[in-house]
Amino acid sequence: DKIKELNKALEKYLEEHKDENTEFVSGLYERDSDFLKFAMYPEIVSEVKQLIGEDIILWGSSLFCKKEKNGKETPWHQDGEYWPIKPLESVTVWLSIDEVTEENGPLQYIPGSHLDKKLAEHNTLDSTNVTLNQTLKNIDEIKDQAKSVILKPGMFSMHDVYLFHGSRANNSGKRRAGLTYRYMPASSFYDHAGAKVIEDKIGYSLQRQLHLISGVDKSSNKIYQNHTK
């Protein structure tokens, strides 16, 4: 049962890292390879192919585990503000481990905000109560258009690299844990050297293992493992 597998992997990770902040953990499968297999679920890869084609590189994963009380807010942002991908094409899968409700801080998004494929201006936040330190500058003008993504355990949503999205703090008394997996078309290039400039801005490493999970690499990426053989 996949939901049991997800929970088992999460509980093991939380136990092993109980003295660390696990509300936001980047580079997840580099830290714990147990999380790599979930990115290759056939039902997920099939949906990713419909969006970015047959040649696919898995390049990142994160854990978002909001505590039952005082679970941190994720500020409104675009994922592309953080990522050294050229050309900038990527899709994120948000895989739910816990039930996601309106009360426990669901992912929210602005419909259609990705369509012009442009990065909007972001500000840097100086706060310990958020998972990320970048936020969209003029988001207050359109927040009333936001929609919430409500999920049962094992369900997943997908969003584009340019989509405006974020999530509220969790004070519901009910944990909200989920995994994100990042995929890019293998026609794009992950610029490990260029990532260092962004790292200084966001405060965490963007050095990633790249996994070819479908098709062929077309942009001379530094592939860590080829899963198509």
What are these regions (language model features)?
Residues 67, 101, 116, 185-187, ...:
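Feature marks short, surface-exposed loop/turn motifs that line or immediately flank catalytic pockets
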Residues 14, 156, 162-229:
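Non-heme Fe(II)/2-oxoglutarate
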Residues 102-168:
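Double-stranded beta-helix
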Residues 78, 131-143, 173-175, 193-201:
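Short, surface-exposed loop/helix-turn segments at secondary-structure junctions
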Residues 77, 84-102, 150-153, 158, ...:
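Short, conserved beta-strand element in jelly-roll/cupin
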Residues 31, 59, 89, 103-105, ...:
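Residues that flank catalytic or metal-binding motifs in active/ligand-binding sites
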Residues 1-85, 122, 194, 208-212:
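Non-heme Fe(II)-dependent double-stranded beta-helix
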